[in-house]
Amino acid sequence: MRASPTSPPEQVVVDASAMVDLLARTSDRCSAVRARLARTAMHAPAHFDAEVLSALGRMQRAGALTVAYVDAALEELRQVPVTRHGLSSLLAGAWSRRDTLRLTDALYVELAETAGLVLLTTDERLARAWPSAHAIG
């Protein structure tokens, strides 16, 4: 019996909001994010890790996560297969979007646009500001 050929994973840009929901497991969106990211090849701008770190730190300071939990989440983040892309080639395009997007969000949008990939987010504000983004959850 021959195995059926498998299709290559879908290439996507994932933003920090989706990864935080996945790692923190504190929102109802965690399962939706996990399901949507299954069998994808993820890409993100290089500032992705800093944004995830900042969000997890805010959650810990607010009492939603323990220090030990954040430590474990950061280890999990280190192991997530996300291809990080340098920022220098994205800066001008992100800057051109300054009137409609937060500049950190514009870096994700610019990467998705220039690479021709879908942007996945759980950030409702980003999804409203850039309708081509696919909101999860």
Swiss-Prot record:
The protein here is known as Ribonuclease VapC3
What family is reported? Belongs to the PINc/VapC protein family.
Family matches, as Gene3D superfamilies: 5'-nuclease
Q: What is the lineage of its organism?
A: Bacteria, Bacillati, Actinomycetota, Actinomycetes, Mycobacteriales
| Biological processes annotated in GO | positive regulation of growth; response to host
Provide this UniProt record's keywords sorted from A to Z: Hydrolase, Magnesium, Metal-binding, Nuclease, Toxin-antitoxin system
- Start and end residues of each PINc domain: 12-129
- S-S bridge residues: none
The organism encoding this protein is Mycobacterium tuberculosis (strain ATCC 25618 / H37Rv)
